[in-house]
Curated annotation (Swiss-Prot):
Coiled-coil stretches noted in the UniProt entry, renumbered to this chain: none
Organism: Streptomyces coelicolor (strain ATCC BAA-471 / A3(2) / M145)
Designated name of the protein: DNA repair protein RecO
Keywords: DNA damage, DNA recombination, DNA repair
NCBIfam families per UniProt: reco
Function, in words: Involved in DNA repair and RecF pathway recombination.
Gene3D superfamilies for this protein: Nucleic acid-binding proteins (2.40.50.140), Recombination protein O, C-terminal domain (1.20.1440.120)
Gene that this sequence comes from: recO
UniProt key word DNA damage: yes
Gene Ontology BP annotations: DNA recombination; double-strand break repair
Gene Ontology CC entries for this record: bacterial nucleoid
Family: Belongs to the RecO family.
Length: 248
């Protein structure tokens, strides 16, 4: 029997019995973790209020084995709020739908429980903080998070040089299956011809150039979001259910 403590973002919850919940978190030190929180569905449970989606929490776990993950679900025995990001997200539809897509993405990219995914964790914390504060348009924050999540998981798209032969950009065509921008010689059936402005926007979101991103016209934001969605769908093999509700 062992105790573990870690910081985490609550990704989702599901009912268990009459008063309990299974809490899924993305933690700093242990990656994705599922744990049972007892009694949190009772009306007066302050413990349960701290374990809602979007919450950034400091959590203590009790495990029957010497490892946090592997021998049944651990118990979540204590929780302290680090940052209640949900308060700045759930009251606004655009922020809420963007945030929900972020949580689903983070869970999809951490499909092996107990494996540390520090970069993905830090990306999620930063994106939710930015979203909750309303620093940029929710769609831009979401697309930046999706692109960077793809990058830290080894699927970084290119928006200039050819993804196949390396020909210096800008290149006219874009292929999700080829890895992004491609030259005329490397284009494949199904390649599209995005506007230069949309590609510039996506490059800015990937690198954190918010001045360029915030100045983008709505039509290029919509076009860029379509490319991000298609690229993500290709690499995840199936799309995110939550993306269909995101306002573009």
């Amino acid at each position: 029997m062992s105790l573990f403590r870690d910081d985490g973002i609550v990704l989702r919850t599901q009912k268990l019995g009459e008063a309990d919940r299974i809490i899924t978190l993305l933690t700093r030190g242990h990656g994705r973790v599922r744990a049972v929180a007892r009694g949190v569905r009772r009306t007066k449970s302050k413990f349960g209020a701290r374990l809602e989606p979007f919450s950034h929490v400091d959590v203590q776990f009790f495990s029957k084995g010497s490892e946090l993950v592997g021998r049944g679900l651990p118990l979540c025995t204590q929780s302290e709020t680090i940052a209640p990001y949900g308060g700045g997200i759930v009251t606004d539809y655009a922020r809420y739908t963007a945030g929900t897509a972020m949580l689903e993405t983070a869970e999809r990219f951490t499909d092996h429980e107990g494996e540390p995914a520090v970069q993905q964790y830090l990306l999620l914390v930063g994106a939710l903080r930015t979203l909750a504060r309303g620093e940029h348009a929710p769609t831009l924050v979401l697309d930046a998070f999706l692109l960077r999540s793809l990058a830290v998981n080894g699927y970084a798209p290119t928006f200039g040089d050819c993804a196949k032969c390396g020909m210096p950009g800008p290149n006219r065509f874009f292929s999700v299956g080829s890895g992004g921008s491609v030259c005329v010689d490397c284009r494949v059936p199904g390649s599209v011809v995005p506007s230069p402005q949309a590609l510039e926007l996506l490059g800015a979101l990937l690198t954190g150039d918010w001045g360029t991103a915030d100045a983008a016209e709505p039509r290029y934001v919509r076009e860029g979001s379509g490319l991000v969605s298609a690229y993500l769908h290709w690499h995840l093999e199936r799309g995110l259910r939550s993306l269909r509700y995101v306002e573009k």
